[in-house]
């Protein structure tokens, strides 16, 4: 059975009948802040030990742990870790003791064994760092958002074209979420017909006291649509099979953080894809402390033959477990709990793409288009005059 047929059969088998109730231990422990979102799955190595050596550098964001969880579960070996702050290196090695501390980034890039460099630098530094990595002959995997300016994106596209290396992005709200990946398979099968609209609601908990200073500086974090919005635009492109889109509306605001006037705690945007599908995105930093996890992220997909709702991280006041998929179609109503049943196949596919120079996990054009849309939405957004910003 080929891979595509296997995925189709696997998704169809879960959709065909109600799944047995899953234990709470099947779900990842909820993180207080999305910055610490680092799912752990079951190991499914696609390479032998030592066959895919990687390095982790610039540990400015906690997503580096999620990136490395996914890669090591797929068989990658972390050979080096580097950050100017030795405390970050020590914390990283506590979870990944196999990683040896490098003296410098240059030492990492000079190692001919290293095939991939993973990073979670300050957002404004991710694009230039990636170009440096690619120029050294390595593939690059960065946390989102990969860029804060369109100029950085243009430079990265040029370096990818000249080097042939991969510049990939950790769009974790789909790639590292089982409900999100299950929906990917459902779209491939056409379960709800042609997709008309995708609505993404992406609230996050701010946890202000734990955030570094750069997180609140506009030139460094890029803006809320550039940051959290990049996840949502990537999902829209995937679920609608669109390869491009136009921004028709974008708004940003700072409603509750006057102590950080450059910060944006709310944003929304509307898009029309080149498939004529529509997208509405709402992103915010207003998850209340009473919620059991960092955000009640939801995705609503409207098709010509049904609807899909993803309750990714919690089912509020009903079930504090994760990865709930609700489907309505011509046959009825369905709830499918997919935690522990889908896995995180992107990482293994990505490793094989790096080795085989293929594009099974995701195309380079797709990764860059999601980033481009987030940058365009941010640039076109009307900034609301609020009491916090005035």
Predicted stretch roles:
Residues 62, 87, 318, 337-348:
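Active-site loop of classical SDR/Rossmann-like NAD(P)-dependent oxidoreductases
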